Amino acid sequence: MYIGKLGDGTHADDGIYVLLKEVLDNAIDEYMMGYGKQIVIDIDEVSVTVRDHGRGIPLDKVKDVSSKMNTGAKYDSKAFKKSVGLNGVGIKAVNALSTEFYICSYRDGRCKSLLYNQGNVVTDFPEEPTSEENGTLVRFVPDETIFKGYKYKDDFIESLLKNYVYLNSGLTILFNGRRFHSKNGLVDLLNEKMTAEPLYPIIHLKGDDIEVVITHINQYGEEYYSFVNGQHTTQGGTHLTAFREAASRTIKEFYNKNFD
């Protein structure tokens, strides 16, 4: 897994945001598989808590999933198409890079939790009954000897969460009490980013494995937002290059033909 630069949180690509994203990705995967419509995130001065309402990790697998390599559980055909990560490395990396890492799975009226320090088990709590809804709770404190003087910036987190809800219309994310939700998905993203009225209604195309929204405004320049497997590809990639070439070619072919 790639953490990126360590940093202290002053840049959007600093490692502490990658840690948050790795935990969130598991919750998002649950939503994409049809389980849980809300994710709750609480961040204070040092700790991060993420609670989803998915199925919950099988109770006998919580320790393996959070600390043993190559023990991911997303291996059906739909997961291969949609999931951000399949081998389960992300959550283990967060564990290893945290001075405190607590995970609790709520499943069918029972729960199982563990507390770690830098990847080492501190307390393996016994399984017990619970009245909590199904899902998983993760709380972690990034290791300040690695991420020196770190501090999360709300602006960076809010930008990340907006992308999550644009890509997963119908999902609700609560961040320190603030609600993020999108009814129209990527159309909402485009409407937010536009700096002028569109020259024509937004074109929205959606298939099983691709979604495209596009329009033009009466200004110079171009602006693209591309995503793969739920991740914002800020540097573009072959997917963006291919789309731009196809869009340009289609317009040229259309206007070079004779029409009645």
Where in this protein do the model-derived segments appear?
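GHKL-type ATPase core
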Residues: 49, 53, 60-61, 73-194
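Ordered, soluble secondary-structure elements with a strong preference for glycine-centered loop motifs
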Residues: 6-18, 33, 52-60, 87-91, ...
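Flexible hinge/switch segments at interdomain interfaces of large molecular machines
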Residues: 1-9, 43, 129-139, 212-229
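Bergerat-fold GHKL ATPase/HATPase_c domain
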Residues: 1-24, 28, 64-66
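Active-site phosphate-binding and catalytic loops of NTP-dependent enzymes
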Residues: 5-9, 27-40, 72-83, 103-104, ...
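Conserved beta-strand-loop-beta-strand hairpin that lines the nucleotide-binding pocket
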Residues: 28-75
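GHKL/Histidine-kinase-like ATPase module
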Residues: 155-158, 162-164, 170-260
